[in-house]
Amino acid sequence: MFFKALFLSLYLFFFISYAEIIFCIRIKRNNLYNFQNMTNSLNIKNLDDVKEKVKYEKHTYCLLLDKYKVNKILKNKRAKFWLLDIYKFPSVLKYKEYKNCFLQNDHNDKNNHMLNFIYNNYLKKRNHQNVKNESENGNYNNDHNDHQTCNNMNIFFSNEYLKSLSNFNEEDFRLIPLNDFFNKILLELFYKQREEIIHDDVIYSKNNIKSLSHVFNDNSPEQYRQKEKQQQVGNIIMCNSNSPEQYRQKEKQQQVDNIIMCDENLCETLIKDDEINENDDNKNPLENLCEDFKKDKDDIENIYNMHKLEYIEELFELIKEEDIKFQRVKLEFGYDNMNTSEILRKIFPCINEIIHKFEIIGHIAHLNFCDKLESCKKIIAEIILDKNKSIKTVINKKDILNNTHRTFNIELLAGENNYVTQLKENNIRVKLNYELIYWNSKLKKERDRIYNLVKDNSIIIDVFGGVGIFSLSLSKKSCLCFSNDINEHAYKYMNINISMNKNKNILTYNMDGREFLEKLFNLKIFSKNNNVLTLYINDQNQKNISLDVLNSKNHIITGNGKNKSKNKNENKNENKNENKNENKNENKNENKNENKNENKKDIQNNNMCEKENNISDRKCPYIHNNNNQRNITCDNNNNNNNMNVSGNNSIHQYTDMYEHKFKYQKIGEENMDNSKNEENHKIDINLNIYEDIHILMNLPQTALEFLNVFKKYKKEKNDELRNVFIHCYYFAKPEFFYEHAEKNILLHFNQLPKDIKITEIRKVSPSKLMYVVEFNLKDLL
């Protein structure tokens, strides 16, 4: 009975445990497979743990030479190819500091003998070629001492070498480390030169057998010497036989034996170093790391494959001429000798996605972490912040772009809480607040493509302009630019960027995209029949543009020439007017010189007018660039906009209306802010200078829905239209990208244009790509 109860209790226990496991798998799958304890498994909690984790050692050959001969190596481009190039590690080391890191050249060091063998055979070939050349020229000398003794040369540093030097001083010697390509060429040359010795009947005489034995005699292991003797005998027999097939088989077996006899430590070093070199990337580690590294590595590999023999001969020549020795040294590397990419690969070798999923915006590094990296994102952020001195802030995007202004919630991972940053793209300075404004550095290639596509003297209409980067770029091609964004913060920095870059051909607006396009339709800007464009602009656009620039074909020459002095005078006058307005409400003594001919009553009336202008600006929004209707006055009772004022009225008439309207209204404080005061400025632009129109609609989430606004454009009879090219960006699945664009165009226009061009911009996710559809609106109107 007892055993039965025990059996039932155990059965019940296992059944409940099994049920809990099934419940976790089905209901709590995310928590079960979320890699929450990844950093705990690595035992990394801070930067000190990271530094300890990434330490490694490297055994490498070094050139040991006098400090006065170092420049001959460094200035030789061919020899420089073989030098070690590790991030923030010196190319030249002091002998005194690294003498304790020397690896002893004992009698069993096969790597050293292999290098001796290659170097001496190189000298033998060179001497043999010199003798041959001398014999052809009739200057043959029977002295073969050099030829006989070259194989006995030891090119490695030793204590005996030190004793042979008079007045030895440690301060006078330097070490130059060699890279992994040097190790690689050693193996290749070793097998290649042995094959040449085996195949060449002339070289393989008795004297050459003896000279070859000198290379490995005494300094090589007993097993290797026995193996070498067997190979020599076998090779002599094969040279006298007429069985090439057996010779090839014997040769293959010999190569295998040589590989086995080769120092295993060297092979392991080569393999490990190749793995490390795959992480080498001296370029910016925060932008397309994997692709950039592959390109760099391929370039170096190509150089190696094409010029390795020339370069190694050049190095051996320098070694012979300058009496340079070799020494194997143990070098230690760590956190300071690795860039961001290498450190992340070392710590997280199985997670490639963290290497390339962040971008730089000025001093801000923006990362997109997946769930499985949630527990280690702080460590990664600290590494990025510490290894990149230009980065001050590291952030993570918490959610997707799901609002009108295309901004997202920011999670500060490391660094300063400062999101106002500056960056430079194609010599254009851009300032923005990354927390309040959308910016994507990955669209640089698309901006360059549009720049190359647009011709000079075009008209640019950027409906969703952001900080105005498209207009800032295309303004260099003497284009008339209209840049708009509904985000008031983007509008603010758009004007700041125009001022920073000293552009004088960009008009800026802060309106809804549909309303912005409708107002431009009323300007008849699409028509070739309209020769002069008359605009009424606000104070901000008055500062942004220059009529001399807009009415010239080459904006750059005009802007840098005569117009420069005019702009200075205009700016001086504007500054004087601004200073007057600011100082009117200050003490009488400060304004005495500026307002000598004005009486107190006029000053008071002017102040009343200006302050009421501020009130009117706050009460009723100003609609820019409307020829037919102007928002001039504001009704006190219902705050409705008055649209009945003609566009031909002068600025003085508007001022008189303001004075009459608010003459008797009480003034509050005398130092009221006048910064928002706006007046209408009439400008005329010669449209005959400009040709095609390009409408940029970079709002991929909803841009296709805005196409229906073009149906409101009414073409007049006998009206010849310009080419109006639409560049509409959108998201779509890769298998339906063309059908998606075609469907939306048909939906809004009931027909398709003659030519439709669709370009893939970038991959947002595996099932979501960004495209741009381009067509001529002229075909649909």
Curated annotation (Swiss-Prot):
Belongs to the class I-like SAM-binding methyltransferase superfamily. TRM5/TYW2 family. The keyword S-adenosyl-L-methionine applies. Its main location: mitochondrion. Residues 556-610 are annotated as: Disordered. It comes from the Eukaryota. S-adenosyl-L-methionine binds at residues 447, 485-486, 512-513, 698. This is tRNA (guanine(37)-N(1))-methyltransferase. It is found in: Mitochondrion matrix; Nucleus; Cytoplasm. Keywords: Cytoplasm, Methyltransferase, Mitochondrion, Nucleus, S-adenosyl-L-methionine, Transferase, tRNA processing. The keyword Zinc does not apply. Residues 567-610 have a biased composition (Basic and acidic residues). Monomer. Specifically methylates the N1 position of guanosine-37 in various cytoplasmic and mitochondrial tRNAs. Methylation is not dependent on the nature of the nucleoside 5' of the target nucleoside. This is the first step in the biosynthesis of wybutosine (yW), a modified base adjacent to the anticodon of tRNAs and required for accurate decoding. GO terms for cellular component: cytoplasm; mitochondrial matrix; nucleus. One of its GO terms (molecular function) is tRNA methyltransferase activity. One of its GO terms (biological process) is tRNA N1-guanine methylation. Its EC number is 2.1.1.228. It catalyses: guanosine(37) in tRNA + S-adenosyl-L-methionine = N(1)-methylguanosine(37) in tRNA + S-adenosyl-L-homocysteine + H(+).
